[in-house]
Amino acid sequence: MRFMQRSKDSLAKWLSAILPVVIVGLVGLFAVTVIRDYGRASEADRQALLEKGNVLIRALESGSRVGMGMRMHHVQQQALLEEMAGQPGVLWFAVTDAQGIIILHSDPDKVGRALYSPDEMQKLKPEENSRWRLLGKTETTPALEVYRLFQPMSAPWRHGMHNMPRCNGKAVPQVDAQQAIFIAVDASDLVATQSGEKRNTLIILFALATVLLASVLSFFWYRRYLRSRQLLQDEMKRKEKLVALGHLAAGVAHEIRNPLSSIKGLAKYFAERAPAGGEAHQLAQVMAKEADRLNRVVSELLELVKPTHLALQAVDLNTLINHSLQLVSQDANSREIQLRFTANDTLPEIQADPDRLTQVLLNLYLNAIQAIGQHGVISVTASESGAGVKISVTDSGKGIAADQLDAIFTPYFTTKAEGTGLGLAVVHNIVEQHGGTIQVASQEGKGSTFTLWLPVNITRKDPQG
């Protein structure tokens, strides 16, 4: 069963790592496809309008060419242009000179007026090949304008006209090579297609961005869930250990303490009756000391596993830290260890059990003193941190190996030849009961720093520590 659960967890971790990459790749590919295809439909509509405009222009040129051979008058050309302008989708038709003055127009009233100014004609630069532009709205209809030089006669025809015989004594009229022809066709469908393409592309890109964002957020949320679940599993394991220890401690306390009291009493009895300095006296003292040690182990075990009842009150941390340092000052001075702490007047009072916090600090100090041995420094700092306070205890001792850092708060884990291995477990338990956290940073040979975070109000807890 456990193997199957591990397999599922491994598969879930693998999928959580690979799926976001796959989704991002697919979204990127789809986005490139959408962007690449953008404008294809509108381009097809535009080409259809251009072709329509060019066909009508060529038709007018052909009609004019035939008319020249038949000596077509201006009025007849105007009529031909008006007839062609009546084709479906044609908004207007015009022929201008090089200065933009209208020579022919689908609206006869506009003949002789300026369609465009000379400057505008310079910018338009009509050429032999057709050009186009969108005019926006002509009255109420969006228009696409197709224009080029008006060429009713190709170059060979123009060259031949100079040598043509006169008809009835008159030459066939020649056309100004700089005349330009303009046709405006209805571009409503083109504009609608462009708007639809833009709207659809934006919708698709927005949907892709939403999918991408959701995938990224899901990835981080899932990773956060995995971390939270792992923390909960670790916490459950620790609680299970404490429950087991609780049952063990209850049995040990019941079965051992009464005999221990008898053993200690007998040891003192024999010590008092044995000659001072003799072997029997020393053995009796060793028995009494070991009985005390075993009784202390049982007491610490009970302290660890029994429910902690906090006597909460407003605590001035500056006062509490100074008091706790005084309790270990004699031991520290005997080892030539300096104790350093500077009061921080900006610290807020916190709701806590002062006796329990003093116990926490004393355990940390005693561990630091044992880690230093002789000649060193223990520094204590306190500062405000978010909705709580942070207390750091730093020593110049031998440090903790990296592979041991994760186990130092485990009951009965110790790196010392002497000790029960319950001190830091008790510290962790008390800090947790206060709604706080404790972390350790250490390098072997460079000392250690234990950092406590405690909320100002015990109902609040900093999840990040």
Curated annotation (Swiss-Prot):
The chain crosses the membrane at residues 15-35, 202-222. GO terms for cellular component: membrane; plasma membrane. Induction: Induced in response to high concentrations of Zn(2+) or Pb(2+). Expression of the zraSR operon is positively autoregulated by ZraR. Expression also requires the RNA polymerase sigma-54 factor. GO terms for molecular function: ATP binding; phosphorelay sensor kinase activity; protein histidine kinase activity. It is found in: Cell inner membrane. GO terms for biological process: cellular response to cell envelope stress; cellular response to lead ion; cellular response to zinc ion; signal transduction. Keywords: ATP-binding, Cell inner membrane, Cell membrane, Kinase, Membrane, Nucleotide-binding, Phosphoprotein, Stress response, Transferase, Transmembrane, Transmembrane helix, Two-component regulatory system, Zinc. Autophosphorylated. Its EC number is 2.7.13.3. Residues 251-458 form the Histidine kinase domain. Contains one high-affinity Zn(2+) binding site per monomer. Part of the Zra signaling pathway, an envelope stress response (ESR) system composed of the periplasmic accessory protein ZraP, the histidine kinase ZraS and the transcriptional regulator ZraR. The ZraPSR system contributes to antibiotic resistance and is important for membrane integrity in the presence of membrane-targeting biocides. ZraS is a member of the two-component regulatory system ZraS/ZraR. Functions as a membrane-associated sensor kinase that phosphorylates ZraR in response to high concentrations of Zn(2+) or Pb(2+) in the medium. This is Sensor histidine kinase ZraS. It comes from Escherichia coli (strain K12). The lineage of its organism: Bacteria, Pseudomonadati, Pseudomonadota, Gammaproteobacteria, Enterobacterales. The gene is zraS.
